[in-house]
Amino acid sequence: MDDDHKVSNDISLLPDLNFDSSSPFTSIEFDSSICDLLNLETGGDTPNLIPDHNPFFDSFDGLQEEEEDSHFVVEPESPKVYIAPRVMINHQDSFSLDSRNDEYIEDVKILPGSPGGIQDLGLSRLKVPGSPRAFVHPRSSGSPRFVSPTSPVLIDTAAPFESVKEAVSKFGGITDWKAHKIQTIERRKTVDQELEKIQEDMPDYKKQAVVAEEAKHQVVMELERTRNVVEELKLELEKAEKEEQQAKQDSDLAKLRVEEMEQGIAGEVSVAAKSQLEVAKARHLSAVSELGTIREEIEMVSNEYESLLTEKDLAAKKAEDSVLKAKDVEKQMEGLTMEVIATKQLLELAHATHLEAQEKKLDAAMARDQDVYNQEKELKMVEDEIKRFRQDIDAADDVKTKLKTASALQQDLRAEIAAYKDSNMGKRNNSDIQAAVDSARKELEEVISNIEKANSEVKTLKIIVGSLQSELAREKHDLSETRQRNREDTREEKCTEIAKKLQEASREAEEAKSLAIAAREELRKAKEESDEAKTGLSAVERQLMESKKEMEASRASEKLALAAIKALQETEYANKIEDISSSPKSIIISVEEYYELSKQAHEVEEAANRKLAEIVSKIEVAKEEESRILENLEEVSRETAIRKVELKEAMTKVEKARDGKVGMDHELRKWRSDNGNRSPEGGNKENLSKSKSALHQPTTFTFGEQASSSNVTPQASSSNVTPETETKKKKKRFSLLPKVFMFLSRKKSSNK
């Protein structure tokens, strides 16, 4: 299997040998396409794949007659072959200019059957010339060479390749893979460099885009301005065209009138006078229509002015309401600040009390640890003494038993003495008997004194045991008190939690204070905006007054124009009357005077139009300012509403903090009231010191006082106890045991 994946010049032709070893091996025939494929491009001879002398074939020369039974015979009419995978060589460095050196396509057609039995026959491998640097593609699972013998047979009916170039061109052509790989790497590098350049240029392009947007915006604004200017110029052009037409009409009429006057035509016959009258009538009608439109516009402006006045009054009322609300909010904020200050002071007091409680807790813990250590030490000593006392009691019991035995022996001795007296009355002397009796009496007295001493020692030991039992009871009581102190420590931990809650409440109060400060700033801003709105309203009022004055001036100019029109009408009426009467008293106006009058009327009309336009523009500006002021007032009202909501939230937070503070104060008072009668530093220590001091007196040691001191009830007073008295009482507690030792040593010395 390893040879199949290596670069090799050899391809083994493995015929199907899946038959019995006794079957004859007759011949191997190849299709003509194999020979054609193995030819060189120049048409060289077919290479001899089978050597001339092969011992393998020599051994089977006698079996060539049985060609019908052979499995290796391939008929030329219908050759059934397996197509081995083609190996295409494409290394440019192995090519040369000589066309004969082109690579072979190693296409071997294998006879039907599985390549399995070649090892049994020992067939030598057939070699096909190939390139020394051939690259064999890995075989796929679908290759016909790996198909089982039972699979359907594939028949190659395609025409053979005439040359290697044809085969290569059929399968994609010749390419330089090394150069192609280098080109792809270079392309990738160039693409990466271009990407890096693009990424580096991205911010510059973004800046350019922003600048272009700004320039576009400016150009759009300039376009709008130019449009407005163009519209204004169009209006001015229309006015100029109208004036030019009127001037042309006037000049034509003046020329006609001059010609008629030169010709001597006058009165009704003059065409110029008629046309002049018609023009004057048309102008009069246009002026009347313009006056009507101007009146309508003035009425609209006056209505808008009245609406602006009403809106101004409403805005002023809203501003006053906002100012009042701001003042109320300021008052509320002052109250909140006072409450926040008070809560801060209370929190500081609570923090101080918490610190004091922690200090007391630490002192109590230290004292408790010291007491526990001392009590354990004393308990060990007392246990040792109890063991000794028990040994002494056992010794006393032994003495009692010995005394009983001695009394029994005494009775026996007395009986023996009496018997001896009765028996040996006459034998012994009275002096010897008396001496024996005296010695026996002395022994009895010594035994009796020893018994009395033992009894007294037993009594003293019983008393000491009772005192020690009372001491143990007191120690148990002290242990219970220490447990109670531990419980109080848990309470103190609860107090620390309460202090933490107080700190959280103080933090919330500070947050509420900051919110209140922010609300104050917002109110100040609202006041400033309301002041600005007031100044804007005053400016609008001034502009409205100016517009009123301008309207009055326009009305005056309108009156002047009406008076001029009336004068023109009167002159026209007079001319008509003169024409009708044709009297020589008719007034003839010169052309210059007529031009002057018409010019004055035109100027008056233009002035009225200009004033009306100015009034309209000022009214529009006033409307815009009023709308801006109203928008500002609406924003102020919205902000005040938001600040009100924030103030309500701050008030709720402050109320919650106040409730928490009150609850914490209540819990602190309860804890103080619970721990005031039995503080860990005062009452318990005083009880212990009194119980310890009652065990001894500085001069004598009496068990009656010891017994009476065990029944004394301590009085707790945390204020009267000082550390000096506590240390003295601790020192007095150790004076009991040495006196007991002294008493016992005296007894032992007296016994000796």
UniProtKB/Swiss-Prot annotation:
Region spans: Disordered: 476-495, 653-733
Biased composition (Polar residues): 690-723
Keywords for this protein: Coiled coil, Phosphoprotein
Annotated S-S bridges: none
Coiled-coil regions, chain positions: 186-557, 596-651
Residues the record lists as Phosphoserine modifications: 143
Leader peptide range in chain numbering: none
Biased composition (Basic and acidic residues): 653-675
Matches recorded under InterPro entries: Web
Pfam families, per database record: WEMBL (PF05701)
Keyword Aminoacyl-tRNA synthetase set for record: no
The family this protein is said to belong to: Belongs to the WEB family.
Protein name: Protein WEAK CHLOROPLAST MOVEMENT UNDER BLUE LIGHT-like 2
